[in-house]
């Protein structure tokens, strides 16, 4: 018995409870009218087996293959399979002749005469199938006698599921053939055989895995089906027309009479579950359930097939051209079919099926001879263009992630698909699904509308499809910088350019961004914001209540400085993180936010639904043990979201700081709604820079979550879920430095009036800040006008002369080194005096750190960091000068713009920042010397205005002075001293006093660690 791709199979499972222990022997059902049950032997015996296996009579319809062929294999009734076979190609209706009633079978029986080989094959298959059923019966009977008389529901369900899947596999794999047999038969095909095989395609096509489309079979499951259990009813229908028309008029993947519903899966040859919900690869649509739905579907199918003859009349005139086109496309089509080996596994069939779909798409791209008709072009073009466009769209994503080379354009989609599979993208299997299901291939990669001007992905499918996450879980390799060991050095810093580009400010508001203001301007804005906020509070605060007062700590109380040396992620304030790594958020927390933003935006109720405590605890331990190598692939979105909430809840103080948290709450409690934004802008400017950067990253991230309609989490919903964790509401800590006085709850446990008011204000405030996150981090324009003269005076300019002035001086015979000579002499003088007058402070990672005030009265200090390096001075100079990528993890790109003279050049480099904050761009004039006494070397640099504007990559920062001094200190060793003062924009002088010195010390430590440490092997010997 055969079941081809054009058949319709329906499985119905009826779960019945047993009446008693002997119900298995009492309730017996015949599987066919040709069988009888023998009570003595407890077996089924055929009644007139010769009649059963004989060919059907010409005058009667052959119904032996259409009746029920399964019986109860256990007390729980198993699926009843009903098979309808299409007519053989020999009896296809000719054009111009209407099919008679005799041509239409009652139950779609097999038509035509069968040869002796076909009869022998069918007998062998029928006997094998019946033997298989009897063996299952005996196994189950013996198992039931040994076990308890009454089976558990779980056991019955397992037996039912296993039996039904074995039956489905036997049916569905019977028509497939191995790829090697198909290749062998196709290699020896001729022109006549090609034509013969084309005409017999309706039967041959389903047997070759090349033409088996996953979308051509529909699997219908009940609407109340629970994934993981076998369904009550399972219906598999083909999309091929039931009429016996030639396949030239029907292409796999087209909908004929079955447009009303589509299954959520199409794999019928795999051991994997074919009814589980797979939303990522198979877009589900509403499934019609029940007998009424099936009747409606049958009526719709019949109506569609009734118009098929009219359509064929219009298409039949193009038949000759179609056959010419088919010969040109498939010159090696094999003439015959070979027997499939029974041992072919369903996994092999599914693999061959995916590969052959890619071959089919590549062959359908351009016909070699002849011109395809209009209807054929309409069907071929979507299948060809979409895979061809996929590599071009995935290329920016591959460049951004730097995990694999971007696929090069290729003439055939099959080659593109092969390259996509090697580069971490999804193979042609997903592409064919997208085309068949009515979605473009851009659903699995970043579409052109989701790419910004720089070519970076905006929605991070990052977005290369669900299967691309397998490669994302591997250790990330640093982007190739083309310099030495950087080709294989892993990057610990997160590159999240799509988050930066998606929140890039507009040209009108770019100059008002806080992160573009100089340090002196930020200092003025602090004073103006404090005055404005004081005016708001004095105007709207109730006079007799203590509202706008920052309580001072007790006079004799000593605040013990906490020790964070044993902590890495949780409970560590942003200031410690930025001193350690240069970024206020840990890398693992940024990875968690990126994972949620790129792959979990469609999770309904994210941040509202709770995760599993045990899994959250495991994630927390992973963050603490290896904060730079945490992979969230495959983790539940709700677990990762709860982990984020725990991080902000476990901070020593709220992200708004203990001093300003009450101020933020009072803004949304006392001020009118139209004053919220102005007051919140003033309060945000008063936050420490590291806290403000964390708050900006969090609010931009939450705005992206709220903008996704699929998760049903608006800004208000997110505020309700996150406000208690971010504001630290109703959390009292004995050792907390917070001056806020918590209101005590009543004895019955109810929250007090102040608690309710604080919760309401926090929810409204966080919702407002998420909605207006873009404006919240901009400088108020009226404040800039009020500070007009002083604000403009605080804007810095490059300390050195412009490049045009240097060229004029060089033309006049003045050496360019004279412009840097003062800088060099200051460095040599300080070194000769052993840096007298510098104030030492504790430095990280075995470095010496010191600072002093600038002689020009600028609020930014000079910082000095020094350490010993296991390399001679000349090698250290080359490492600093030409191999920055080896020690600067934040470096994005660097280039020498122009070599002005020996030892003097114009240098441009860009460093990254924590997303979504902009990158820092530097254009410096640098000069070096390697002829100092005792073999010492030095390098000095400072910013200048280039002659031609250099395209900015973010914010143009100012390097006021940068000096490197390499002094020999032993055999093969040197002492490296780095003196630096820079305005990175967007940071206050207080940030430079607390953070910038640590960043300089970390820089010299990375230069030191970039050289291998040589250790002597073996014990010391006395000479």
UniProtKB/Swiss-Prot annotation:
Effect of residue 608 to E: No effect on cell morphology when overexpressed
Annotated region described as Disordered, given as residue ranges: 46-67, 82-161, 387-461, 467-486, 733-757
Residue ranges, compositional bias (Polar residues): 99-114, 143-161, 441-459
Modified residues annotated as Phosphoserine in this record: 108, 235, 238, 498, 506
Signal peptide positions (record): none
Biased composition (Low complexity): 387-397
CDD domains: START_STARD8-like
Arginine finger (site feature) positions: 608
Outcome (variant: residue 242 to K): In a breast cancer sample; somatic mutation
The organism's place on the tree of life at top rank: Eukaryota
GO molecular-function terms, A-Z: GTPase activator activity; lipid binding
Entry comment describing in which tissues the protein is expressed: Widely expressed with highest levels in kidney, lung and placenta.
Job of this protein: Accelerates GTPase activity of RHOA and CDC42, but not RAC1. Stimulates the hydrolysis of phosphatidylinositol 4,5-bisphosphate by PLCD1.
PANTHER family on file: RHO-TYPE GTPASE ACTIVATING PROTEIN, STAR-RELATED LIPID TRANSFER PROTEIN 8
SUBUNIT field: Binds both the SH2 and PTB domains of TNS1.
Name of this chain's protein: StAR-related lipid transfer protein 8
Lineage start: Eukaryota, Metazoa, Chordata, Craniata, Vertebrata
């Amino acid at each position: 018995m055969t079941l081809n791709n054009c058949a319709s199979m329906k499985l119905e499972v009826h779960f019945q409870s047993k009446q008693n222990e002997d119900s298995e022997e009492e309730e017996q059902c015949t599987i066919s009218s040709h069988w009888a049950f023998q009570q003595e032997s407890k077996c089924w015996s055929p009644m007139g087996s010769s009649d059963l296996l004989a060919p059907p009579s010409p005058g009667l319809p052959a119904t032996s293959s259409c009746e029920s062929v399964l019986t109860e294999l256990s007390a729980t009734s198993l699926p009843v399979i009903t098979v309808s076979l299409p007519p053989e190609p020999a009896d296809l209706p000719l054009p111009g002749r209407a099919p008679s009633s005799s041509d239409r079978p009652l139950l779609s029986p097999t038509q035509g005469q069968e040869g002796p080989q076909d009869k022998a094959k069918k007998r062998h298959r029928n006997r094998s199938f019946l033997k298989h059923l009897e063996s299952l019966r005996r196994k189950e009977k013996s198992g039931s006698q040994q076990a308890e008389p009454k089976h558990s529901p779980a056991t019955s369900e397992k037996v039912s599921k296993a039996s039904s899947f074995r039956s489905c596999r036997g049916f569905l794999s019977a028509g497939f053939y191995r790829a090697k047999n198909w290749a062998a038969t196709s290699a020896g095909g001729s022109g006549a055989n090609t034509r013969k095989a084309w005409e017999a395609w309706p039967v041959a096509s389903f047997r070759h895995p090349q033409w088996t489309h996953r979308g051509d079979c529909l699997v219908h499951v009940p609407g109340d089906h629970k994934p993981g259990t076998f369904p009550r009813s399972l219906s598999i229908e083909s999309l091929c027309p039931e009429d016996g028309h030639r396949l030239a008029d029907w292409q796999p993947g087209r909908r004929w009479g079955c447009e009303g519903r589509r299954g959520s899966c199409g794999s019928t040859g795999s051991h994997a579950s074919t009814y589980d919900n797979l939303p990522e690869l198979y877009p589900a649509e509403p499934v019609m359930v029940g007998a009424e739905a099936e009747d409606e579907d049958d009526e719709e199918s019949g109506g569609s097939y009734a118009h098929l003859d009219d359509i064929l009349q219009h298409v039949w005139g193009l038949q000759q051209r179609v056959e010419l086109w088919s010969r040109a496309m498939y010159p090696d089509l094999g003439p015959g079919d070979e027997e499939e080996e029974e041992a072919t596994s369903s996994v092999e069939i599914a693999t061959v099926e995916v590969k052959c779909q890619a071959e089919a798409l590549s062959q359908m791209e351009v016909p070699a001879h002849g011109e395809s008709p209009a209807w054929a072009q309409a069907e071929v073009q979507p299948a060809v263009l979409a895979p061809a466009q996929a590599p071009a769209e995935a290329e920016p994503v591959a460049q951004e992630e730097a995990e694999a080379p971007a696929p090069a354009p290729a003439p055939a989609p099959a080659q593109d698909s092969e390259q996509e599979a090697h580069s971490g993208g999804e193979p042609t299997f997903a592409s064919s699904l997208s085309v068949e299901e009515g979605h473009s291939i851009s659903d699995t990669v970043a579409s052109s509308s989701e790419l910004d001007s720089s070519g970076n992905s905006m929605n991070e499918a990052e977005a290369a499809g669900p299967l691309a996450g397998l490669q994302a879980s591997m250790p990330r390799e640093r982007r190739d910088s083309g310099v030495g060991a950087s080709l294989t050095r892993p990057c610990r810093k997160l590159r999240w350019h799509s988050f930066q580009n998606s929140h890039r400010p507009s040209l009108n508001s770019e100059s008002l961004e806080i992160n573009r203001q100089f340090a002196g301007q930020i200092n003025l804005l602090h004073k103006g914001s404090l005055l404005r906020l004081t005016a708001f509070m004095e105007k709207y605060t109730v006079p007799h209540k203590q509202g706008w007062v920052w309580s001072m700590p007790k006079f004799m109380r000593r605040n013990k400085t906490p020790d964070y040396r044993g902590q890495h992620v949780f409970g560590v304030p942003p200031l410690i993180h930025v001193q350690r790594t240069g970024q206020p958020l840990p890398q693992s927390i940024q990875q968690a936010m990126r994972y949620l933003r790129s792959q979990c935006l469609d999770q309904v109720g994210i941040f509202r639904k709770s995760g599993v405590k045990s899994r959250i605890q495991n994630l927390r331990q992973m963050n603490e043990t290896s904060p730079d190598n945490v992979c969230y692939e495959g983790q539940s979105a709700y677990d990762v979201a709860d982990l984020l909430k725990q991080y902000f809840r476990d901070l020593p103080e709220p992200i708004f700081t203990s001093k300003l948290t009450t101020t933020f709450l009072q803004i949304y409690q006392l001020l009118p709604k139209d004053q919220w934004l102005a007051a919140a802008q003033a309060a945000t400017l008063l936050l420490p820079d590291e806290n403000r950067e964390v708050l900006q990253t969090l609010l931009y991230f939450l705005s992206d979550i709220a903008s996704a309609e699929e998760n049903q989490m608006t800004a208000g919903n997110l505020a309700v879920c996150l406000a208690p964790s971010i504001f630290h509401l109703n959390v009292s800590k004995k050792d907390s430095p917070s001056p806020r006085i918590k209101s005590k709850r009543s004895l019955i446990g109810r929250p007090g009036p102040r608690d309710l008011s604080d919760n309401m204000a926090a929810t409204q405030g966080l919702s407002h800040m998420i909605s207006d996150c873009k404006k919240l981090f901009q400088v108020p324009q009226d404040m800039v006008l009020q500070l007009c003269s002083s604000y403009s005076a605080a804007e810095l300019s490059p300390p050195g002369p412009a490049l045009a002035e240097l060229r004029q001086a060089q033309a006049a015979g003045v050496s360019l080194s004279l412009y840097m000579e003062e800088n060099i002499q200051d460095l040599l003088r300080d070194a000769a005096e052993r840096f007298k007058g510098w104030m030492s402070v504790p430095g990280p990672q075995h470095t010496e750190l010191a600072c002093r005030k600038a002689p020009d009265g600028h609020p930014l200090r000079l910082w000095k960091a020094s350490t010993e390096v296991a390399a001679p001075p000349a090698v250290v100079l080359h490492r600093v000068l030409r191999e920055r990528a080896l020690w600067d993890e934040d470096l994005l790109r660097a280039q020498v713009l122009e070599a002005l003279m020996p030892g003097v050049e114009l240098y441009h480099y860009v460093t990254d920042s924590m997303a979504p904050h902009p990158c820092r761009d530097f254009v410096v004039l640098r000069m070096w010397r390697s002829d100092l006494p005792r073999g010492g070397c030095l390098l000095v640099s400072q910013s200048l205005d280039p002659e031609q504007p250099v395209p900015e990559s973010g914010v143009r920062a100012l390097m006021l002075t940068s000096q490197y001094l390499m002094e020999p200190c032993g055999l093969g060793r040197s002492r490296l001293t780095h003196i630096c003062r820079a305005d990175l924009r967007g940071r206050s002088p207080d940030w430079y006093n607390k953070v910038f010195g640590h960043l300089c010390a970390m820089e010299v430590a990375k230069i030191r660690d970039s050289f291998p440490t040589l250790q002597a092997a073996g014990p010391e010997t006395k000479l």
